[in-house]
Amino acid sequence: MKKLLLTVIQIALLFIFARLINWVTALLHINIPGSIIGIVILFTLLHFNIIKLEWIELGAAWLLGELLLFFIPSAVGVIEYGDIMSKFGVSILLVVIISTFVVMVSTGTLTQLIAKRKEKKHTCSSEL
């Protein structure tokens, strides 16, 4: 029961933090979405131990675990615009497939380059 209460409190804190950042970005007329700024600020606060990971870990883990639930409204929105999907559905699907493929290839290539660079660095340092 204590873990559940702690999780709910942490989710509430994350929600309040998100709303606060969205409010500040709207107030300052910043063109970057509040969610992006919030992620950067939260990462910075965590990195410098201003916010301890334990303070938000359970809530964040639950939110990540239930992430699929947050995409249901988007799926319902797609279904609501069936006429647009019937006209452009194939094009949208092709864009999604091609962009996913490009991201996968780019990520794989970059990962291989980084691994080779680390291997080369490790080999050079062991020769000394």
Curated annotation (Swiss-Prot):
Transmembrane regions listed in the UniProt entry: 4-24, 26-46, 59-79, 88-108
Classification via Pfam families: LrgA (PF03788)
GO biological process, one term: programmed cell death
InterPro entries for this protein: Holin-like_CidA (IPR023760), LrgA/CidA (IPR005538)
Superkingdom in the source lineage: Bacteria
Record's bilayer topology term: Multi-pass membrane protein
Subcellular location as annotated: Cell membrane
Any single GO CC term annotated in Swiss-Prot or TrEMBL for this entry: plasma membrane
Keyword list, A-Z: Cell membrane, Cytolysis, Membrane, Transmembrane, Transmembrane helix
Keyword Transmembrane helix: yes
Keyword Repeat found: no
Family according to the record: Belongs to the CidA/LrgA family. CidA subfamily.
Main function: Increases the activity of extracellular murein hydrolases possibly by mediating their export via hole formation. Inhibited by the antiholin-like proteins LrgAB. In an unstressed cell, the LrgAB products probably inhibit the function of the CidA protein. When a cell is stressed by the addition of antibiotics or by other factors in the environment, CidA possibly oligomerizes within the bacterial cell membrane, creating lesions that disrupt the proton motive force, which in turn results in loss of cell viability.
Record NCBIfam families: PRK01658.1 (NF002460)
UniProt protein name: Holin-like protein CidA
Species this protein is from: Bacillus subtilis (strain 168)
